[in-house]
UniProtKB/Swiss-Prot annotation:
Keyword Transcription regulation: yes
Protein name in the entry: General transcription factor IIH subunit 2
Keywords for this protein: DNA damage, DNA repair, Host-virus interaction, Metal-binding, Nucleus, Phosphoprotein, Transcription, Transcription regulation, Zinc, Zinc-finger
Domain annotation VWFA: ranges: 60-236
């Protein structure tokens, strides 16, 4: 038997001559190289925002989870299913934190079938509870991309034109068992303006590549658990909207939270409309959010009124969605030895010890790398610009 020629396979390219990346400092330590790699990873997401482009702010997303027998593989610990469900709990929390006026639903596919784990909803606690219960789910059979996408499309095609229609598939298997030609379904999805993205857990699959390319989505295959989490995080921010999507004014209601007690003689107990589609038994309560149009009561916001269809939100919900449209500009990176100002971070008041500091171009305040990442990822506004006190006009 002839020996296999010594050439690097394409998938091994990232591991070729890895020792050349590591460089020793004057004392022979590799710490500086490792810190530089971690530093670049921290700064990477700061530059990944879309800039001032048109975004789909009101999102409707279905997450399709592969429940086939391949999800029992233990290359992710303790297995693919448990790891996926834990990361999806994190994803749901981040999704609603960054997109409070959006909705999400979960579909599971196994044994050549697909079924909804949760309906399209804006209640994160409902989804997280279902994900926790799904840990005991039995994985068997093959997945069906066709059936999963058909179920998602049945709901998404009726969504208003000004909202984004998205599907995110977590695909573990290398095969799909479909009852009909999936390429015809891909054309239908494209015509319905449904964007489909795929995260692969095994290897690249041709049909997933075509699906993502034709519908305008993305397709990535994970390297490890940390990369898996990073790929999920990419789907938290709203995608750029197509130029053909509708523009329209949306009626919204801003109900105030009414607090009543048993001692209040005018208070009248009432049922919450949110219990109509829930498994919990409805109960009479005093307080809540009352729709300004039809006076229907709800326990939490945001929600679409089941009586009159009005979208009920609070002002902070819109404010948290607004920052996607006008993202904070990246701070200017300056070597520490070239910076002549105070050597303390404006955000955490810690001493600046890193090789680089970050200066806001507007208020000229300086930040460390951790505060820079926190400001751009979570705060979305410069604390120096907010607290900048203008000089009195008489001076």
């Amino acid at each position: 038997m002839d020996e296999e020629p010594e050439r690097t396979k394409r998938w091994e390219g990232g591991y070729e001559r890895t020792w050349e990346i590591l460089k020793e400092d004057e004392s022979g330590s590799l710490k500086a190289t490792i810190e530089d790699i971690l530093f670049k990873a921290k700064r990477k997401r700061v530059f990944e925002h879309h800039g001032q482009v048109r975004l789909g702010m009101m999102r409707h997303l279905y997450v399709v989870v592969d429940g086939s027998r391949t999800m029992e593989d233990q290359d992710l610990k303790p297995n693919r299913l448990t790891c996926t469900l834990k990361l999806l709990e994190y994803f749901v929390e981040e999704y609603f934190d960054q997109n409070p006026i959006s909705q999400i639903g979960i579909i599971v596919t196994k044994s050549k079938r697909a079924e909804k784990l949760t309906e399209l909803s804006g209640n994160p606690r409902k989804h997280i509870t279902s994900l926790k219960k799904a840990v005991d789910m039995t994985c068997h059979g093959e997945p069906s991309l066709y059936n999963s996408l058909s179920i998602a499309m049945q709901t998404l095609k009726h969504m208003p034109g000004h909202t984004s229609r998205e599907v995110l598939i977590i695909f573990s298997s290398l095969t799909t068992c479909d009852p009909s030609n999936i390429y015809d379904l891909i054309k239908t999805l494209k015509a319905a303006k449904i964007r489909v993205s795929v995260i692969g857990l095994s290897a690249e699959v041709r049909v997933c590549t075509v699906l993502a390319r034709e519908t305008g989505g993305t397709y990535h295959v994970i390297l490890d658990e940390s990369h898996y989490k990073e790929l999920l995080t990419h789907h938290v921010s709203p995608p750029p909207a197509s130029s053909s999507s509708e523009c329209s004014l949306i009626r919204m209601g801003f109900p105030q939270h009414t607090i009543a007690s048993l001692s209040d003689q005018d208070a009248k107990p009432s049922f919450s409309m949110a219990h109509l589609d829930g498994n919990t038994e409805p109960g009479l309560t005093l307080g809540g959010y009352f729709c300004p149009q039809c006076r229907a009561k709800y326990c939490e916001l945001p929600v679409e009124c089941k009586i009159c269809g009005l979208t009920l939100v609070s002002a902070p919900h819109l404010a948290r969605s607004y920052h996607h449209l006008f993202p904070l500009d990246a701070f200017q990176e300056i070597p520490l030895e070239e910076y002549n100002g105070e050597r303390f971070c404006y955000g955490c008041q810690g001493e600046l010890k890193d090789q680089h500091v970050y200066v806001c171009a507007v208020c000229q305040n300086v930040f460390c790398v951790d505060c820079d990442v926190f400001v751009h990822d979570s705060l979305h506004c410069c604390p120096g610009c907010i607290h900048k006190i203008p000089a009195p006009s008489g001076v």
